[in-house]
Amino acid sequence: MGVLVGPSGSPALEVDGAAVLGGRVIEKVFSQFSTNFSMTGNTISVPTAGANTVCGTTPTTAINTWAFSTADADGNTLANGQSITVTLIIDANSAATYGDGCTVDGNNVANGVQWSGGSPPLATSNTDILSFIVLKDGAGVVRVYGQGNTDFS
């Protein structure tokens, strides 16, 4: 049995156990391809409250650090034993290199993003799709796993 929770206008369904969906699952997309991602220096902000899929453009500078915010509309962040998957669809440029530094909710993540293949993907001048799993295990240890599919044209 599920329970509908959350603030007015931002409800969430909490389910303990399996959930079987008999049709399509449609996700909300946050932002627009023409919108610049929020950058401070060489740190890109990745908010997860709005949607699991975020699109935008990158500046012509290196992205050294990925700053994930897992807070929902009520300010609740990932609890122990929870994870979230977020996909960035980037109208990219090859000058915006991707790094592996990482924070989650303002806290440094030891070893940064653990990329598939061991290294960050190379940025391209076409569309790059980067997917991240932000995971907090039962003891509170946070890891971030990244996968890059690049050069869609």
Describe the residue ranges of each PLM region:
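Short, surface-exposed charged micro-motifs
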Residues: 12, 43, 131
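Exposed extracellular interaction/assembly regions and N-terminal maturation sites
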Residues: 18-105, 135-153
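Short solvent-exposed loop/turn micro-motifs enriched in small/polar/acidic residues
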Residues: 6, 37, 124-127
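Extracellular disulfide-bonded cysteine-rich modules/repeats
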Residues: 126-135
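C-terminal trimerization/auto-chaperone modules of long, extracellular attachment fibers and adhesins
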Residues: 1-21, 26
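Terminal beta-strand-rich extracellular "head" domains
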Residues: 103-124
